[in-house]
Amino acid sequence: MKNIKKGILNCMKRYIFLSSIILIFIIFGIKLGIIISNSSYYEKKLEEKTNIYVSGVSSPRGRILDTNGKVLVDNIGVKTIYYNKIKGIKTIEELEIAWSLEKIIDVKEASIDELKEYYLITNNNGKDLITSDEYRLYEERKIGNETLEKLKLERITDDMINYDTDTKKVAHIYNLMNKGYIYSKKEIVKNVSEEEFAKVIESNIPGVTGEITWERTYLYGDTLKNIFGKVGPITKENKDYYLNEGYELTDTVGLSYLEKEYEEYLKGEKAKYKVESDYKLVKIEDEKKGNDLVLSIDIDLQMKVDEILRDKITLGKKYGNTEYFKDSYAIISNPLSGAILAISGQRLNDDNAFSDISLNTINKSYTMGSSVKGATIAVGYKYNLITPGTYINDACVKLEFIPQKCSFKRLGKVNDLTALANSSNYYQYMIAINLTGNKYKPNMKLNATKEHFKTYRDMLASFGLGVKTEIDLPGEQTGIIGSTVADDLLLNLAIGQYDTYTPVELLQYINSVASGKRMSLNLMKEIKNKDKIILENKINILNDVDLNEESLTRIREGLRLVLSEGTGKFYVPQGLDFAGKTGTSESFLDTNNDGKVDTATISSSFAGFYPSEDPKFSIVVITPNVSHKNGKTDAFYFGASKITKDIVNYLNEKY
């Protein structure tokens, strides 16, 4: 019985052993089959591990176009000379290459440090500069190689490196030839002439190539150039971000504004090279141009608006009290989408030349005055502080210890519509007073609180005032929100004379009045590659205006009366179905740069849209410091009105 059991056990062991062997062969066969069937994949992986690949020096970025397809920003090929190190090349051979290049191309002379390095490589590595005792200390490891090299450099005198001009240039070329990784291309000189470029190529100098790199060119000069933004090398602050995104530190990227905002679409793909064993570069992938950025900007309209601003600033300077008047802004958009058609800022400098300050539209703020009353009157509607259509007598308000506050003139009887049409401050004051729970009486105290200010600011923000517009330009700032709580400042806030707003905030506000919705402003219309649309802008609604449609309709009607019979009667051609609001405000300047405001000025503004129903255009115009506080002149009145009228005339003529 024992023998039988033992035999059975031995058979089982043999069976398990044979089964294991068979299973191992099956697994091996499956693995071998997988490897054979995927041989190209593994060959590629092996190649990636055993070969070195490098990118080309640059690739063309995508163009920037206007809404009609006109090219605004393009790329220009720059003829550039490069050196690719040859495996096993000797120093004397590289110096010969440098001398050959120096005879063809013009480069700057070497720096002192470069000249000292040149001296060492051409003088037995400076061995004569080190004493025998110092060499002994080095051999005894009492001083290191770093100390030895430092001593050599310190002992090279000015006379030793007093080379002629040609030699100094050769020293600089040699230094450029030996920068960076051994297998990477070294830029020797860029923007060479056609003749120099041809000579370098014809000379067939070992390791030297002539290639085209790409730089931005602006087809309309400085127009919108600061809005486009800059491109350049990766900055130290952004190094980690770009490296994580797969960039190389030598890459050119968008550094600001539109170039930065749409970097991921505008960037091109550089050519790819395989590094052969002799360091020769073999191209395996061609470069690819980036996608084109199409803007909502109409460049013809943009240039016309720029021209109008320059003309009207120049004209205004002929009037009195305009010492501080030098800037003007105008923005035009589609109020139902937020698409910007023109965005302009012009400044007259002391040398009577103009500069483009269009970026101030997103990062510089002003008190806008009565032009924001379309939003402040909304507080009265929402909280039932006014009765639509009911008339009151326009008058002045006198609070305790505060000088009386009035409209710019006595307006007689006004209701909500005519108060907007004729810019009654008194009507707005009554809304603010009613908000505090008081009934007006002379020399009263309102006891205004933070909550009263918040009520106004929440409503203003609902229209886009005091908050970012979310325009697709990095660096947008909001205006200044006053921190002091006081009775008179609540009244000031109600007439747009306390907080400050940027020009784009004013634009978003008037668009919100027109549509009933606060939409982000945008410059990007679409991004495309040839005829294929990669990304298309979509209307981005940030919030609905915090007001019912009946009240919004009432506000629009009041703004229509502004242009037909009120303070804006001469801002646009008569008979045009236009809605808008004029504004004047008190501003303060620091004229002697001592950090303290010392001069009171008057600024004017306008915000409007037309037609008043289903509008096609919205316009804001701002003319800061157009006059002195102590003397309103014709220049004050002409500021925003003349600019607005000229822009509207052009729009009617062309569109």
Language model regions located:
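Structural motif corresponding to the C-terminal cap of alpha-helices
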Residues: 41, 308-317, 348, 439, ...
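Membrane-proximal periplasmic segments of bacterial cell-envelope enzymes
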Residues: 2-260, 264-281, 285, 328-329, ...
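A short acidic/glycine-rich loop-to-helix N-cap element
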Residues: 625-640
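Short, gly/Ser/Thr-rich active-site loops of penicillin-recognizing serine hydrolases
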Residues: 534-536, 638-655
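Short edge-strand/loop segments of extracellular domains
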Residues: 88, 102, 527-532, 645
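Solvent-exposed, polar/charged alpha-helical surfaces in well-ordered, non-transmembrane soluble domains
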Residues: 92-99, 103, 198, 202, ...
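Short, basic/aromatic recognition patches
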Residues: 43-56, 301-323
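Beta-lactam-recognizing serine transpeptidase/beta-lactamase-like catalytic domain environment
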Residues: 71-74, 272-286, 297, 301, ...
